[in-house]
Amino acid sequence: IFDIKTTEGEGIESKGIMTINKGDFNIEAYDDGINAIGKLYINGGELYIISSSNDAIDTNDALTITGGMIIAIGSREPEGGIDADVNTFKITGGTILGLGGATSKPTASACTQNSIIFSGTNANLIIHIQSSDAEEALTYEVPASVSTILYSSAKLKTGATYQMYN
């Protein structure tokens, strides 16, 4: 278990490529929770990341997520839950919830797992995402007011319509 709390600076930073394969991460950072100057690969693990003044996950290069359970909560716009600048953001597995003022959009041509982006909600409200045929995709209590919600999971079916309630 990695329990990281900062009152200044990043939670975890790499000047090159960063790869996370497994582990439990609880990161509460003033600046970016996870920051990679190079490519960032998340292949597994359970990550709960919150930034009080910047992005929860930030890479200046491509971001690839193949597995894991990720909750990434960034601060207000223009900061976000997940920031891959304008680089490739590839999702092929895992469960990802990105909350914040903004989010990078997954690169559709690179992804093999579906994602959805919703407008935000207020703090301490429970959001419920479900398909038009009432199949639950997610229920989660949002700890802070956010403008953007990104969700990706194997539960999201191609061609289905999803709505968020709170």
Cite the ranges covered by each PLM segment.
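A composition-driven surface/loop motif
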Residues: 1-166
